[in-house]
Amino acid sequence: MNAIGTSLKDAYLITNNKFEDERGFFLESFNLREFEKITGVSNFVQDNHSKSSKGVLRGLHYQIQHAQGKLVRCISGSVYDVIVDLRKSSPTFGKWYGVELNRNNLHLWVPPGFAHGFYTLTDTAEFVYKTTDYYHPEYDRTLLWNDEELGINWGDIQPVLSLKDQDGKSFVECDKYE
């Protein structure tokens, strides 16, 4: 397990060694001891798995209380994954980072205090992630995916959105972390 820094404080791309031969491959997809060395985090409580069709955009989601750290990975297909730092005390507050995730064994560590979302680039994509806290619907928030102030470069897309994601708050209006 190796970490590659991103442009946002405390967020990392994480790679794992993959061993391939004529039979297939072996990949240790997660190792808590190694992950804790990189991030200091050792308290995952939930695993989630979603499947999305091409053009679906999910997010940008976060919990204002019981903030969730997320270790995300795309296991089939391809997504454009975006995170936004909502921690007022962070030097990268209000900045975003985007990366394409696919079957290339990259994980993205999304620390607590970030909004997270992704856009499906292929016919379908399966996305798995671990969280450091449970889902609490009463604290669930959505940051508007196409907020002008943030200026996230999604490319020229017409996404399929849930009603919840259509009604996201602008960066100026959204709840933030102290």
Positions of PLM-derived features:
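Conserved metal-binding segment of the jelly-roll/cupin
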Residues: L101-T122
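Non-catalytic, conserved peripheral segments adjacent to functional cores
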Residues: M1-R103, T122-T124, Y129-E178
